[in-house]
Amino acid sequence: TTYSIIFGNGSNYASIELKKEAIYSNFIDRLWRAVGVRLLTEYLEGLRDGKKYRFGSAVMSDHGMELERKKLFGSNERVFCRWGELVIWNGAGVFCIGKKEDKKLAATFSYQEEDNIHVLEAAIRMFWKRGGDRLSCLLGE
């Protein structure tokens, strides 16, 4: 197994490939503490202030996600789903989010190809553990 770590900023990025899981886990733990918590806090503060964030074709707001239903004929349809209407899961190298009652309304995000998907996943998992109606309630204010 090869473990890949990709990190960077708006202009540069670096990629590291590791063979040992212990080294990979240690690196990821330190990277999360150094950067992940700050990114998570910035997203939550932005959401609280009314900002929206795009991940692929999906748009995240404080109250839920706007997902895109792809149509074979005609233009695609955008559907807003509140956090309580959504479900998440993982596939091979991807994070997925979709509407509970509609298997055709879902978005898939590549961990390697899209920025900050781990932060998005962490925020949603923490939110569902804690509960609430707004993602920014994780700030505890």
Segment roles from a protein language model:
Residues 1-56, 78, 84-141:
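Acidic, Ser/Thr- and proline-rich intrinsically disordered linker/docking segments
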